[in-house]
């Protein structure tokens, strides 16, 4: 029986933990990134999002750029991040200027790569991640062992 580790957030820590501790494969061995691997989430929002089958995850009515109110999860107070208002998720890895990722990852669209054209590339990226999540859940229904990995924020 194969083992599939799926991160349920709260930041990228669970995905890293899963890869470093053999709970899931790494990309080089075929792992497909899932929606909660590289973002700042919260467990109630994750549960609601899964119950909604990701219906509002990339919905235009719930996406905006928001200033982070505090330092947490590798983000800096005042940093402007893509935010889902329904689930209270921050998409920090695709936000303008976060950690200089647009430079280090060579985003072809520059600093606004994921927010231009009404978040078109953000939606494309996360739709792929949602499909990977669904595929892994289906594999679990077909006999693979699924291990959900979740961290929580401690104030």
Residue ranges and their predicted role:
Residues 1-155:
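Extracellular glycan-modifying ectodomains
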């Amino acid at each position: 029986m194969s083992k599939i580790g799926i991160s349920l957030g709260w930041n990228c820590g669970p995905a890293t933990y899963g890869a470093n501790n053999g709970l899931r494969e790494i990309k080089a061995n075929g792992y497909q990134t899932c929606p909660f691997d590289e973002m700042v989430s919260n467990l109630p929002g994750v549960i609601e999002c899964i119950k909604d089958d990701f219906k509002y995850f990339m919905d235009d009515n719930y996406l905006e750029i928001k200033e982070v109110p505090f330092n947490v999860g590798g983000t800096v107070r005042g940093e402007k991040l893509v935010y889902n208002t329904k689930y209270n998720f921050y998409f920090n890895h695709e936000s303008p200027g976060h950690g200089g990722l647009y430079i280090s990852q060579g985003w072809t669209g520059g600093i606004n790569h994921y927010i231009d054209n009404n978040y078109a590339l953000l939606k494309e990226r996360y739709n792929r991640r949602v499909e990977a999540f669904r595929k892994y859940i289906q594999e679990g229904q077909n006999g693979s062992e699924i291990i959900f990995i979740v961290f929580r924020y401690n104030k």
